[in-house]
C-alpha cells in the first residue's frame, strides 16, 4: 500500500498462501489509490518445499505400509504444485486484478525456497526440475545450482500435474497424515527460529553499541 516491495516468507500451506495473495492484491489496490507507480512495486511469496518432504517422509516411514512407501518424496512437490495452481487461479479470477495489471501491477511471483535435496535417495535437482513454470523464482543453494547446471532439465514441469497432486494429498489423508497439521508445525517452528536469529542479531548490535559507548 506504501509502494514498498515485499518478500513474504515462511509459507508452507495453501491456506496461508491464499491469505498472502489476497493481502498482496489488496495492498496493490491501496497503492494504486494512493497514487504509487505500480510498475515499480514487486513482490515474491516464498513457499518452502523440501522441509515438507522431510517431515512427511518421517510419518510415512513410521506407517511402514506399501502405500506409505509409494508416497515418500511426493508430498512437497505436490504441495508446491497446488500452490502454483492457486497462484494461477487467484490472479486470473480476482475481479480487481485485470484493472490493476492494466495500470502496471505485476503478479506476486511464487518463490520456491528450501529447494536443496536433503534425502540422498532423491535427485539433487528434484525440487528444481519438478517445479518449473512461468513466473517462478527458485532460491537454490550453490550445490543445487551446480547440479542443475551439470545435469538438470529445467523444462516446464507443473502444467498438467494438478489432478495427480490433489490425489497425492488425498492419499496422505487416507493414511492419517493431515498435511495442514504438518505445515502448521513447520511454520511455527520456522517463525520461532527466525525470531531467535533476529534476537541474536539485535543482541550483537547492542553489544557493539555498548562497547563503543564504554
Model-derived features with residue positions:
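Intrinsic disorder at enzyme termini
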Residues: 212-214
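Catalytic alpha/beta core domains of metabolic enzymes, predominantly
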Residues: 4-143
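Flexible, acidic glycine-rich loops studded with aromatic residues
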Residues: 105-210
Amino acid at each position: 500500500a506504501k509502494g514498498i516491495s515485499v518478500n513474504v516468507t515462511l509459507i508452507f500451506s495453501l491456506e496461508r498462501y491464499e491469505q498472502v495473495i489476497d493481502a498482496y492484491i489488496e495492498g496493490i489496490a491501496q497503492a494504486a489509490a494512493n497514487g504509487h507507480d505500480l510498475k515499480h512495486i514487486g513482490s515474491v511469496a516464498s513457499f518452502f518445499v523440501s522441509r515438507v518432504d522431510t517431515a512427511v517422509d518421517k510419518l510415512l516411514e513410521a506407517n511402514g505400509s506399501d502405500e506409505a512407501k509409494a508416497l515418500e518424496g511426493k508430498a512437497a512437490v505436490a504441495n508446491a504444485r497446488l500452490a502454483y495452481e492457486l497462484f494461477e487461479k487467484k490472479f486470473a479470477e480476482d475481479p480487481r486484478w485485470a484493472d490493476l495489471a492494466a495500470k502496471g501491477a505485476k503478479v506476486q511471483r511464487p518463490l520456491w525456497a528450501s529447494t536443496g535435496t536433503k534425502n540422498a535417495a532423491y535427485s539433487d535437482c528434484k525440487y528444481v526440475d519438478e517445479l518449473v513454470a512461468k513466473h517462478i523464482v527458485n532460491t537454490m543453494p550453490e550445490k543445487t545450482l551446480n547440479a542443475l547446471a551439470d545435469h538438470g532439465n529445467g523444462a516446464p514441469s507443473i502444467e498438467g500435474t494438478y489432478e495427480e497432486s490433489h490425489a497425492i494429498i488425498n492419499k496422505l489423508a487416507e493414511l492419517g497424515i493431515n498435511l495442514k497439521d504438518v505445515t502448521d508445525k513447520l511454520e511455527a517452528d520456522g517463525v520461532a527460529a527466525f525470531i531467535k536469529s533476529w534476537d541474536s542479531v539485535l543482541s550483537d548490535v547492542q553489544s557493539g553499541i555498548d562497547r563503543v559507548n564504554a
